[in-house]
């Protein structure tokens, strides 16, 4: 086995105007009218507690890809979101090849819209865990709302600059941000 160095590693890559402003607005409207909204949060799945723990995460979410049915999400969306999924996955492959160089064989079906209302949040976390999410290597986030329409909602990484400030991703409607799934972050 030959190890490959990554001389140009960045902890995130952001592409502006990945989706047009009009398309962002259409997506939000279309998804909220056609898909089943779920209460987002850290899942509690033991015999005593089944549901959502809002101490760590409080959001609304819509799943946009077919997945195995669980009692916490639908198995099939009402519309076909494959074109959006393919656009994101194609860009993920390109970004990975040029910047991250992870050994990625395929993408999982975790395409979803997450809405953060005024008091919503997601504390420090990574996007990998045991089970199927342990295979994840790259996370993508698309900013669908103009940042002038809300306060807060910063995507921050658990990395600090020279002044000990958390690194924040610029908020720009239509942009997509890729980062390693193991990188701790919060909203």
Task: Show which residues each predicted segment covers.
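Catalytic core of non-heme Fe(II) oxygenases with the double-stranded beta-helix
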Residues: 75-187
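Non-heme Fe(II)/2-oxoglutarate
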Residues: 2-101
């Amino acid at each position: 086995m030959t190890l490959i160095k990554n001389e140009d590693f960045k902890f995130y890559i952001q592409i502006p105007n990945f989706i047009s402003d009009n398309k962002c607005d259409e997506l939000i409207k279309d998804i909220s009218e056609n898909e089943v909204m779920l209460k987002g949060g850290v899942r509690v799945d033991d015999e005593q507690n089944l549901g959502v723990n809002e101490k760590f995460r409080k959001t609304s979410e819509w799943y946009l890809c077919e997945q195995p049915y669980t009692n916490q999400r639908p198995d099939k969306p009402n519309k076909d979101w494959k074109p959006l999924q393919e656009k994101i996955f194609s860009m993920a492959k390109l970004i990975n090849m040029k910047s991250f160089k992870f050994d990625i064989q395929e993408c999982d079906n975790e395409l979803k819209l997450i809405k953060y209302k005024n008091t919503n949040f997601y504390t420090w976390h990574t996007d990998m865990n045991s089970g199927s999410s342990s295979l994840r290597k790259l996370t993508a986030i698309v900013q669908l709302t103009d940042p002038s329409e809300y306060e807060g909602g910063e995507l921050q990484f658990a990395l600090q600059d020279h002044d000990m400030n958390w690194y924040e991703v610029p908020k720009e409607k239509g942009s997509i941000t890729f980062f390693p799934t193991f990188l701790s972050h919060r909203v």
